[in-house]
């Protein structure tokens, strides 16, 4: 993909391979099961992964809404977003993720769901994002009204904001049947030490974090811990908000991409993320129907094994 005659570059790549080999060995020792190269989901449908706390299955690719669905009252943009959601469900998608922080994304999702007759496969993932815990219940009720749902499948504490106060309320709501799962989120590598402590001490069902071909810190501790603790993992920023794809698309798609049924860099990037055995679902955001169909293609076909994942990471890091 990228040739460089500099001998120091070659040494750097060797050390990277050695590091990846050690990381792989540590992962195996931790009990993580990597997919076999060429493994195909039953009947050629979308590949799913189990939520450890319940056994429920979710497709490997979901739909985020940060920026892409923040369209205000632009009716044409709302209808365009509805078509994205329609295509998402048609391709086998389930999990849609949003937050009060995301501007008008919540009412945009609600508009789409209403137009589509509230599709039964929907797995609704929302967040509570407010510093005053006393206002949390009102915010969650407003979010449900925007979506047009009676309860959310998953409620997450957004970016750890006031998590000590919000989590007990969410656990109470879950026990009362007012939501199905409880989670917590972070992004861009923030507050990982605190997140790790929460994962070790709180009975959460989900954790959401950033992970992609370049930002891989979570492989060291958080992803192995999630699998050990039975915590489902949602991955945000799988494309680094588009900057990763901008870099990758300057280069020809490598020959090995066909071996994992990828015909685009977006699918390569997503399959790297979702092939990690601790990852439950990645949530790329898009405002284009063609892109949501392409993204959902990463939930079908073969996944990279550990050896190919190492090669993918090394080659992309060298670009």
What are the functions of these language-model segments?
Residues 131-217, 221, 228-234:
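Glycine/proline-rich, positively charged
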Residues 54-71:
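N-terminal small/glycine-rich loop or linker at the start of catalytic domains
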Residues 13-18, 28-48:
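N-terminal twin-arginine translocation
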Residues 66-78, 125-133, 259:
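Active-site mouth loops of central-metabolism enzymes
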Residues 51, 63, 96, 109, ...:
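Conserved, mostly hydrophobic/aromatic
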Residues 1-14:
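N-terminal secretory signal peptides
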Residues 97-112:
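Glycine-rich, proline-tolerant flexible connector loops at the mouths of alpha/beta enzymes
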């Amino acid at each position: 993909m990228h040739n460089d005659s500099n001998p120091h570059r070659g040494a750097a790549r060797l050390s990277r391979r050695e590091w990846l080999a050690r990381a792989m060995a540590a992962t195996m020792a931790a009990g993580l099961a990597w997919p076999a190269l060429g493994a195909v989901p039953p009947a050629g449908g979308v590949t799913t992964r189990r939520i450890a706390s319940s056994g429920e299955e979710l497709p490997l690719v979901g739909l985020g809404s940060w920026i892409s669905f923040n369209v205000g009252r632009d009716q044409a943009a709302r209808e365009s977003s509805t078509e994205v959601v329609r295509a998402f469900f048609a391709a086998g998608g389930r999990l849609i993720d949003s937050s009060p922080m995301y501007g008008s994304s919540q009412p945009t999702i609600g508009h789409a769901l209403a137009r589509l007759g509230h599709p039964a496969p929907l797995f609704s993932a929302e967040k509570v994002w407010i510093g005053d815990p006393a206002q949390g219940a009102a915010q969650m009720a407003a979010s449900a009204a925007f979506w047009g749902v009676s309860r959310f499948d998953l409620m997450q504490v957004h970016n750890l904001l006031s998590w000590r106060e919000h989590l007990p309320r969410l656990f109470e709501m879950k026990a009362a049947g007012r939501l199905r799962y409880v989670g917590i989120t972070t992004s861009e590598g923030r507050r990982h030490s605190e997140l790790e402590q929460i994962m070790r001490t709180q009975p959460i069902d989900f954790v959401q974090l950033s992970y992609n071909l370049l930002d891989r810190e979570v492989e060291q501790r958080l992803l192995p811990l999630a699998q050990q603790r039975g915590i489902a993992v949602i991955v945000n920023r799988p494309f680094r908000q588009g900057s990763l794809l901008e870099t990758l698309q300057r280069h020809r798609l490598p020959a090995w991409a066909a071996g994992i049924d990828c015909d685009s860099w977006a699918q390569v990037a997503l399959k790297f993320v979702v092939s990690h055995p601790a990852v439950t679902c990645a949530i790329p955001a898009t405002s284009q129907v063609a892109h949501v169909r392409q993204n959902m293609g990463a939930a079908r076909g073969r996944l990279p094994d550990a050896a190919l994942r190492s090669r993918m990471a090394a080659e992309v890091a060298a670009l």
